[in-house]
């Protein structure tokens, strides 16, 4: 049955298709529009299609349409399994629906089943030949056959201004036919730039808009193309104005339309018709001084074609399209041969192209033509004079030798005529390396001499914007005039980005970057900054949506660069390689070149790893080459990390980081970042220690702003990681010491606050943890990490209703994020909904897997200030105990494998979810266990010797979502002690055989028929039943010793084990059989009297406290017991013990612990004998032992094991004991026989002698398990122990079978 919350989240997902229709349409064209129409009023076009497909639309047809729309929504979200389920449901209702057939073909195409898609295409042609549905499926199949490198080449030609060649390249992709829907807009935009083709481009865009009026991207392109021609410019303005109204449904297009509208206004002449449009713009934008100046031109004056051409030229120059820029400037020069700006522009084009002589001539002509603006060109001309020197400086900067470059520039600035140019370059360099103070002084020095220098004005404005001094920065920018409007907007955007970089509030950061996106929607660097901010906020799905245009359809080299950085940063090497293939090596930035080198290193190493069994030599070989940036070491380590081989990942980083004594800053940051990826914050911190605060005082060289930002983020991550590690070990005090610097450095940062909450959780102060989590969540309700933490804290604190409400809000808010469903799983588990918990976990697993594929593509109370303010002192130092560690199955580590990266291995969240699913599935599944065990105990045959065989059969029924269980056990048990030796020493020491011997001796005829049989053998057989209930803190059982034994007993017990923070208190009371011998366990019958005796039970009361100190577990406890039996002397016992064990080695595959145990117990009576009235169990009056146990556990593949060995020393003392302690008459008779020594009877005394023993003690206990299948596990165990006056060994083979795997 579908849960209500799942249905509501699905509806919310469908509703989202309307809210983000503009973004989805860019990627999927008309098909996404069909999915969105589920929530929008039907247009006339939709109604006509509906009439064609279903003339009388019944209720069933409406359901089919809804299911198909759901499928399209899921396909847009890359949720193909959900899409398949929706399509299957629709097919059961209307298998021949043409709408369904088109959607099925789309689904088959998306999952790569092209043959099936082609078959569906043929069926669709037969059902509805020539229909829109057939056309859409044909277009989709054609698009997916297009060569991505060829498409990237066409886009590159268009971006560089070679429109003619770009159009030819596009037409080659389309085989000369009509462009496919997803590429039609960009094709017609490119075609509009070809001479004489503007009309054709307009017609094509008009057809697109008519076919799909909600395609905002096509609407925008049409409006822009119309403004390029004077005859259609007013119509274009009207369309641009209309598009600005779609801020909610198409924010990117609306923002671009506003920018284009303003640009078009500057192209219009000032006439009575245009003046109201300009005035209306000024009313809304009173600070637009450039438009105000334009309006001051004489009314009715003709448009300045030269100015338009110059604007186009500088715009193309700024975009790097040199051919287009040269053509535009030449066009302006043809209109006016003395146009200084056009001449200067041509000079800049020549400089960019490396034609220095030509550039020098153009720049001199520009100064001569317009002396008033000579200052615009003198810096460039001055730079030409010393071009080689400046070239060498640029090469130094490109290679990272910024200090030497600064010295060169300072020298240049002292040369005649070079002060301004060299100082400008120096200031720019200082600004880029974070020396903002020095850069500001140099910019101001230039402006003091030349107040109109545009480069200095813009450089100083960038510095001031970065420091938050917006007022002065805006005042400087206002002095630039209209020709620098694009640069001004870029600087304004950079100011917003700088403000976003300064804040640690993730919500504010996202808000600022979204604001910047409205100003520069095409800026790829702004887009990747927003995506990164969203990821830091926890909204990876939205981050992927923001980056999707760049990842799927990059157009410019900058688009490719940003997309490559994002793909690589998210571990998607496949996507990064594909994007690299579409980018010319000439357009590689240093960062992109580093990524390309990493990809090449990984590819080469991966191909060779498949041919070796031991990768160590290959690791050393791969790292033998120089690694100045750290890229090589990171690439090798990252390859192994992605494969889950952390051993060789650590090895690679260790080799790389120790090859040179003096590592560069770049190397340290690179290696430390990779160390953090493989969860080694200690090594990362050690690498970063020499960098100090990043000012250069520790290393001698200042770090760039980006490097300082990376250093700050790494240090915060290290503090949080080390705190979490110590918290897991139970040492919250030391954890807080590591976390405190991060809390103090940035009190607004979210991750240290959540880490502090985890410390309080670890200490058991769930209420305080909840207060912190809720305070973070109130500040940013979108923070899924905070929400997940709050759900867990509420559940820990017993506030199940609050946990459920928080979890449901998270699912409703972010239904496509795995963390929302992990929170839901915690809430459902807290209220005992096991099936729902399992469904939540599986949903989280699917979503996380898909995310990796995409990126690899009660009222809430409490005072927020108190909750989030870091305490002034360490609140965890007051207590000297920590969080108890479990000695259960160790965490796994995958060893080296030549296989490719497995998501479950390489992603920590996915691995954790998989483990939870596996554990919960087992906890919730009824199970049956069956085994065969043997036990052998030393001693005299017929008395202390014991051989036991048992066949335990266990049935388990889970309760309360697997947190509790009811267990039923039946154990057939067989005991034997062997034949009593027929000697004069042994016979009288069992039962009442002493008197039988005496009677036999007195029987004068001594005939066999009058003799009493003393040749006894102890045998018992029976079945032991037991019923047990257990949960996390209490267990209780009731049962019996084997029914069928001579003297069965009712047994059982109860244990309470509440946990208060990291301390566990155990209190138990139980009644158990003493299984030392056949006598104590099952009871026996005396041959002479026929009386039964034995069957001893101990009634034991015990208390114990367990805690941890870091990796060390300590415990202490004691108890009291009363032993009773049938015709056996009652006894009492006191006992106590202390111990500790510590972790000495652990990786993800093995664990070793070493400990020490001190044991004491003592009984009132010594009853370790077998005459009538004795109990037959080891019961010294004092026993001391000190042992050292060593435990080794681990797993590999389908095997797991757990072995413990111990050795130590024991001292014990036993008092003497009467032969017949419960019968004075028997004892008196025995006293009378004391001293007899014959072949038939040897009795020195009627009391057993006492003893004092000191000896070694030790043993082992081991288990090996093998998982045959998901439902069946086999275990083989064995043990041996030497203690007291006995040795005991045993073995068992058992099977565990899940009856019903949930």
From Swiss-Prot:
Its main location: membrane. InterPro entries: BCSC_C (IPR008410), Cell_synth_C (IPR003921), TPR-like_helical_dom_sf (IPR011990), TPR_rpt (IPR019734). Keywords: c-di-GMP, Cell outer membrane, Cellulose biosynthesis, Membrane, Repeat, Signal, TPR repeat. One of its GO terms (biological process) is UDP-alpha-D-glucose metabolic process. Pathway: Glycan metabolism; bacterial cellulose biosynthesis. Belongs to the AcsC/BcsC family. This is Cellulose synthase operon protein C. The lineage of its organism: Bacteria, Pseudomonadati, Pseudomonadota, Alphaproteobacteria, Acetobacterales.
